[in-house]
Amino acid sequence: MKILVTGSYHSGKSTMIRSLTKGKSISIDKQDTTVALDYGLVNIEDLRIHLFGTPGLKHFKVLRQVLSKGADGVLFLVDSQDKNSDVEAKIIWGEVQEFLPGVPITVAANKQDLPNAREVSRIRKDLDIPPDVYIVPTSAKTGQNVEKALRVLLLVAVQKELNLLKIMQKHDGEVKGIHSLMSDLGMEMGAIRQHLNWLELRGYVEVDWRTFIYWLTPAIKKVIEQPKLILKEFSVHEDSIKEV
C-alpha cells in the first residue's frame, strides 16, 4: 500500500516517517528542509506500507501532485502549536482533494508535546475538517500515537474495500474463480483484470491468469475476518465527532 504523508511546512512529516520506520527512512533535504521527498517502509499486520513524504513549501505543488499518484491513503499532518501554519495547511488540504478525490484521509494533530498545542476539537474547527475524518493527537518527536495514526488510516482504507474483498473471498483459490467474480460483480474481463492488477500491486491478492485463479493473501484474509485487528490495542471512539 502507498500512503502519502503530507501537510504544511515544518508540520513534522520527515520526523513522522523516521519515527514510524524506527529511523530507517530516506530523506532528500537541504538545511533540514525536505526539498523532494521522504520515503520509508513499514509492515503492519503483514501488510507492506510504503510511506511517501512530501515537501511542505507552497511552490512544490507539482512535486506533491506527482508523489500523490496511486496513493491509497493520506496521513495529513497539522502543526498543533502554530496556528499561523493553518493557511498553508488549508491550501495543501485543497490539493489533496484535487489530486486524490475520495481517497481516505486521517489527520495527525502533531507536536502535541509542545506547550500551547491545540486540542483536536480546536484543530477541527480551525481547519474546517469534516466530521467523518479521524484526527489523532500525535508527537512525531516523542513517538506519541504515531503508529496509532497510521493504523487508523489503514483501517479506513481497508474498510473502503471490505465489501469487495468479502465477495472475492467466496471464490478465493477456485479454478476459474475470476469468471465467477465477473458474474457476481457484473463486470467485463477488462475491468476485472484492471482491478485485480490494482489489488495485486498492493499485496491484497495473487493472481494466476493462466487458470483464472486468484488467492487473497494471508494478511488480507486476517484483516477481512477481523478488520479492527489493525488497531491492535488502540481504541477508536466513533462518537465525539470522530476524534481519536
Which residues does each predicted region cover?
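Conserved G1/Walker A P-loop phosphate-binding module
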Residues: M1-H50
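Switch II (G3) loop of P-loop NTPases
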Residues: D46-K61
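Inter-motif core of Ras-like GTPase G domains
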Residues: F60-D82, E95, F99
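Canonical P-loop GTPase G-domain recognition
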Residues: D113-N163
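Short amphipathic alpha-helical interface segments
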Residues: A157-H179, S183, V244
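Short amphipathic alpha-helical interaction segments
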Residues: H179, L185-L201
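Short, amphipathic alpha-helical interaction segments positioned at domain boundaries
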Residues: P218-V244
